[in-house]
Regions:
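Membrane-interface alpha helices of multi-pass inner-membrane proteins
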Residues: 17-24, 128-142, 285-290
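A membrane-periplasm/extracellular boundary helix in multi-pass inner-membrane enzymes
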Residues: 161-202, 381, 385
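Membrane-interfacial helix-loop-helix modules of multi-pass inner-membrane proteins that assemble, modify
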Residues: 63-100, 202-203, 386-426
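Alpha-helical transmembrane segments of multi-pass inner-membrane proteins
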Residues: 56-74, 98-142, 147-156
């Protein structure tokens, strides 16, 4: 802030917002407000395209690497066992993330970054590939809401290709998303016990996995405040609040929540008026996802719409005078070179050039790696008769619980016991179709990992051989100087 030039209006807003952040933190001790504030306030003179490009590399590499490594330690990662897909109790895997739903939200953000990077190049092929990825993530997460939100965003951004400018209907639909989310977050929970429409609200509550009831549990008088409260001192339940708007209200207070929501309404109006359709689709999908998860205003780093808010906040007319407190340092460090900043793009250009020249050979090595992965899975993986997991991680009833004297209890020989603590810990048996589903998941994961390793090996092999034959081929094809 001290090194960045601002107009008078922007400087006043900065001071007011930082003062508000200090008050919220003092009242709530919620460090997440700093992440929200600095993400928005740090967007002065920052290009969205550049931020999204860097985020795509960082987020993509980290997400893929974490999921791939976690596949080898599935039983030691976070999971849930719920009745889903008509298969009885089945596993929902997070693949290294904090919850299966978060796995799908991570994929939502990755898709948004890819779409923003592709811009007009996002066509049917890219839509089909990302939708296939959506199905793959759903195969492990079994998150209905996550799958639906990703599908809506992919379809909406593909729709833009044929209708780049929205009409009244599309504009109205986009601007209704946030009001509907607020209605279901702050109004419907109070009608669960209203006799006239309670049956209707209960049906909606059932369809959305009791999220309306959960919101009602937190909309109590002890959670109300103007500038936030230390929720850890008043929470009387271990229930998880899967709602960003209610989470923001009980942690940051009424006034900051109103200011944040007004900012989003203003951004929606601006994007609609300026026909920024791609940004509008991504924005409304994340706002919709915020009703199902608390990703918007916590420390999860998944709310990329904060970058939109920051860019919107610092819109200004050209030629307006700006002021900087440390202008001397600003001139001195006007241009900062980041070492190896272009290395990922250069490596990608190398890979693309090699793939175009040796496509057939690389595809053969990829197929061989996929087959080898399946063969290794067949040799190493042994299908158990069932699984015995802690009831804490399931939605099973208490009367279906079992207790094991030891982890190697002979009564459950052939079963795979997970997260065993002691003989007093209630456990749940998972068997039947869930076992077959896990076998399929292991084979699919082995095929994909084998194919990825095969593709990497094929590219490295051909890249090494190609460099020996032609030292300038990569430069000529990729279009940059070595």
């Amino acid at each position: 802030i001290l090194l960045t030039p601002y107009t008078k209006r922007q400087l006043v807003l900065q001071v007011l917002f930082l003062a508000l952040v200090a008050v919220i933190y003092y009242e709530s001790r919620q460090i997440a407000i700093f992440f929200v504030a600095f993400t928005v306030l740090g967007m002065k003179n920052i290009y969205l395209k550049k931020v999204f490009h860097i985020a795509l590399w960082v987020w993509g590499v980290c997400a893929v690497a974490l999921s791939a490594v976690s596949f080898f330690f599935l039983e030691h990662t976070v999971y849930r066992v719920h009745q889903k897909l008509g298969l009885g109790h089945i596993f929902r895997w997070s693949l290294g993330f904090t919850h299966p739903n978060i796995l799908h939200i991570t994929y939502l953000m990755l898709c948004a970054l890819i779409i923003w990077e592709l811009e007009e190049k996002y066509g049917f092929k890219e839509f089909a590939l990302l939708m296939a990825g959506n199905l793959l993530v759903f195969f492990y997460s079994v998150s209905y809401t996550g799958f639906g939100i990703v599908a809506v965003m992919l379809t909406g951004c593909f729709y833009i290709r044929f209708r780049p400018r929205f009409g009244i209907g599309e504009k109205l639909l986009a601007n209704l998303v946030l009001p509907v989310c607020l209605l279901m977050s702050f109004v419907l929970p109070f009608y669960l016990s209203w006799h006239d429409i309670s049956h209707f609200v209960e049906k909606i509550n059932f369809l959305v996995n009791t999220r309306i009831w959960l919101a009602e549990q937190f909309l109590k008088s002890e959670y109300r405040s103007l500038f936030g409260a230390d929720v850890s001192k008043v929470v009387k339940s271990s229930m998880t609040l899967d709602n960003s708007y209610v989470w923001c209200y009980i942690n940051y207070g009424l006034i900051p929540t109103i200011l944040i929501l007004l900012s989003y309404f203003a951004l929606l109006f601006y994007d609609t008026h300026k026909q920024r359709t791609r940004e509008l689709v991504i924005l409304v999908c994340f706002l919709g996802a915020g009703w199902t998860e608390q990703l918007l205003f916590n420390t999860s780093f998944k709310n990329i719409t904060l970058l939109f808010l920051g860019a919107f906040l610092f819109l200004q007319k050209e030629g307006k005078r700006e002021y900087c407190l440390l202008s001397g340092l600003t001139r001195r460090f006007e241009r900062i070179t980041v070492p190896l900043a272009g290395l990922p793009d250069q490596m990608l250009a190398h890979v693309r050039a090699v793939y175009r020249m040796r496509r057939g050979r690389i595809l053969c090595v990829t197929a061989a790696g996929a087959v080898l992965g399946c063969l290794l899975c067949a040799l190493v993986y042994q299908e158990p008769e069932g699984y015995v997991v802690q009831r804490f991680y399931t939605d099973g009833l208490e009367e279906t619980s079992v207790w094991l004297e030891t982890e190697d209890d002979p009564a459950y020989e052939g079963y795979r016991v997970m997260n065993y603590l002691d003989a007093q810990t209630p456990m749940q048996i998972v068997s039947g179709k869930a076992v077959k589903l896990e076998t399929a998941r292991y084979y699919v994961g082995s095929l994909l990992l084998g194919g990825m390793l095969g593709a990497a090996a094929g590219i490295l092999w051909n890249m090494t051989g190609w460099r020996k034959k032609s030292a300038v081929a990569v430069t000529e094809i990729s279009g940059y100087d070595k």
